Every structure is written in C-alpha cells, then in structure tokens.
Amino acid sequence: MKLDILIKNGLVADLEGHDYINRNIGVIGDRIVDLNTVDDLQAETVIDAAGCIVLPGLIDFHGHVFHGGTAISVNPDIVCLPNGVTSMVDAGSSGWVNYQLFRNSVIHPAMVKIKSYLNVVNVGLSTLGGGPTGYLENTNPANYNEEKIAQTLNSNRDNILGLKLRYSQDIAKGKQYASDPLLSTVSLARKLDTTICVHVTDSLLCADELIRYFNADDIYAHCFHGTGHSILDEQGEVYAAIKEAQTRGVIFDCSNGVAHFDFHVARTAMEQGFYPDIISTDLTLRNSLRTDKVYSLLHVMSKYLNMGMSFFDIVRAVTATPARLMKMQGQIGTLAPGASADISIVKLRKENVIFEDTHGVKLEGDRYIDNCATLCNGQIVYRRLRF
C-alpha cells in the first residue's frame, strides 16, 4: 500500500524518556499508520524533516473562537493552523442561549478540532469587546438558568467539557448577590457531574481559600497572573494548598492572555518546582496577531523554554495532558498509529527574542520554537517552502 504522505528524517520527542528518536511518520487518509505494516515506503508526498522535530498537532486548551458570535473571538482555522495548532478548547465564549449557534457555525465547519466550556452566564461573553458599547458579563447566580444549562450540557456532552466562570474583582466586587458566583457554579457542576474552569485573575478569594473548591480535572485558569491574589503567599512561597491541589489532580493552566501573566509569579513558582500542567494562550482578537505578548501557542511555549522549563514537559502540556482532558486520548496529542494525522513540524531556532508580561517586564531569550509545517486530518494545511 502506498502512503499518502511520508515525513522522513525528523526527530520525534519521547516524552517519557526525555529523548529524541529518529522516526519516519506515515499517513494514509486522515490517520497515522504503522510503517511496519506498509510494504512500500513510497508516498504521494514526501516531506524531508531533517533538522526538525515532528510533534503531534498542538492543542491550545484555552482560547476564544466563537468567531462571528462574540467581538473578542478569532477565526480558529486562520489563527491556529499556521502555528501548528490543530485542536482547541473554547473557554466559555458561549452560554446556553448561543451555544448551539457556536456549535453549528464554528465548531462543526472548522478544520481545527474544537471542544468547549459552557459559560454559566446565559449569553456567554457576547457582551465583551465591541468598543465603548461592550460591557462585562453579569455573573449574578440569580440569573443562572440551571435547567437550560443542564439541558445544553446533557445534550452536548460529546463537546462540552464543563462549566466556565470568570471570578474576578472587576466583574463581581461590591455586587449585592444573594449567593456567591463561584459557590453557585461549583454546586451546579457537582450536581451535573461535570468539571469547572475558573478564570482566577484578581479573584475575590485568596488562592489558598479559592483552591479548596477545586476537584481533580477542574481548571485553575491563569495560574501565573500577578493581579490581586496570586498563587504566592506573603513570603513569596507557593501556597501549600496550591501544591497539594496539583498533587490531587487540579489542573493549573497558564492561559497567558495579555492580562494574566507575571514573570515574577511564574519564575518564583517554577524555581520552587511548581510548573503549569497546561500551556495555553487565551487567544482573542486583541492578543493573537496584534501583540507579541501572546501571538501564538508556539510563542508562549518558547517563553517557557527560555524560562527553563524542559522542552519535553512543554510538549506534554500542549499534547498529552490536554488530549486527556478533552477525552480524546489516543486520537489527538500523539503520533501513535491509528491517531488522527494531526502533525506539527517545528524547528528549534537560535535567535534573540524578547518576551513581555502583563506589566511590561521583559525577558531576553535566545531560543524559539518555529513552525515549519502543519498537517490536520491528514491534509497539509501549512508548509514553508524551505525549512
């Protein structure tokens, strides 16, 4: 049988052994194939990946891609595919009112594989952005339509991973709510047997108190923010409760954004052995192609590489870990035979690059992870002429 695509001479990252393996990758249709079962290694298309690292298609676990339904969202295929990202999780752009529109108009037709968190706010983030007429969402639990949220979740469990809440001072401080948005969201999630994803930047609670409400596989989003209550205590130590939470399976996602990353918090935590479980962008129209504070998942990955995080751990945080949380283990985030032929071919380049955090603090780096080609569902969707 003849291959459709053969990627030869590339190095594959062994996440368990922290080593590189010389391995050819074969594609037939939309699947990666076991080359031991192929008699003839001839292929319709051959990509010479010499000097490159062949990775599973990258997974951006936190972004906003309800393109056309919210003012802040990006077109996933345009922004993701040239940057090696073939799967994405939308972090609560839609609520129960507009989720079906999101699914029909964006999720279904997109090449990028998209799963989502359902916002507890009825209309999701549709009020954000749009200039002076935009406004923050109303997180008053009195307005949660629990029946409709449950109905939407139960009808779409193949796509919806859990409930999303933005729990920050600018949204809820001083509001006279009869009940707390976080406690109401947690209660509803437990009742519906699902997880939560909580935006914690400038949270209404200290991190060591907030984290008590998180279970295994709940998402602590923007874990390295430096606004208000961070994961560091007054002595600059990562709270013991935060470390314990990671041990019991709470997922800490950096979800960078333009307003959610602080070098001091990140470096201090990493020096103490506390690393993010997931590396993601929080892509929006504001921060994707318009600023280098985020720009792309590869740019954020490169920042962690220059902060000293192992390349193999970085790759795990954008492949294996998010694939499991998306309930797509073995399908994406892997180059194993039978998996979806989602592939990113990257090169580690030695070049000077500057990274900047929310507060304008800069890091001068000397390494960059650069995308050379992307395959999605077995199709070459981006490729440089020369690597």
What are these regions (language model features)?
Residues 41, 49-109:
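Metal-associated gating/positioning segment near the N- to mid-region
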Residues 131-180, 221-223, 229-230:
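Active-site gating/metal-coordination segments in enzymes
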Residues 83-89, 93-94, 109-140, 164-167:
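Metal-cofactor-binding active-site regions of metalloenzymes
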Residues 57-63, 88-90, 114-118, 161-165, ...:
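Hydrophobic faces of well-ordered beta-strands that scaffold small-molecule active sites
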Residues 340-386:
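C-terminal cap of metal-dependent C-N hydrolases
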Residues 167-290:
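Active-site core of metal-dependent hydrolases
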Residues 1-55:
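Histidine-rich, glycine-flanked metal-binding segment
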Residues 265-348:
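His/Asp/Glu-enriched, well-ordered alpha-helical/loop segment
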